[in-house]
Amino acid sequence: ARRDNPKYSAGKTKVLRNIFDVLDEDIDVLVELIGGIDDAKTLISSSFEKKIPVVTANKAVIYEYGDILFREASNNGVDFLFEASVCAGTPSINLLKNDLAGNKFLSIKGMLNGPSNFIISQMEDGMSFEDSLSFAQENGYAEADPTFDIDGIDAAHKISILSNIVFGSPLPPNEFLIEGISNITKPVSYTHLTLPTRHGG
């Protein structure tokens, strides 16, 4: 916690005021959910140096520093788990790494961003982009500042992670085209966006 909250008590749970103090504790695993990039990267790297495995849902830090973090985890012989960083914990990462490991992948297609998914669904029913976004914000499906979602940044982070797993090669930050849904001006069908393709065999 960053400040005392007079309404709630942590009970017997130890509350730390500095996120890095957790590394001075006797812990078996670090669960990183602070978000952001730089502090998260430092915290995760420091955990690996102390031979502490890490679980994270932070797609942004994996997008920016994934190669470094995976290497640090491997060099220190600890696990680095990140299932919740893509598709809200739906077991897509485990599925690709293990259950489908023997398959040959040619491409990855899908709707990876929740707010965009909702907005496109509304547009498919005839609602305009602006009205769909407003409706999503009013009902808590989109942030007050939806830029991260509707400009494709969130989806780019996720597709980079999945690409690294499937093709064994990350998509370097800022080296591939990112286009969100904010330029869609008329109702559109899902089939135009995420039509899956089957290649024989």
Predicted feature locations:
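ADP-ribose/adenylate-binding Rossmann-like module
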Residues: G35, K50-E64
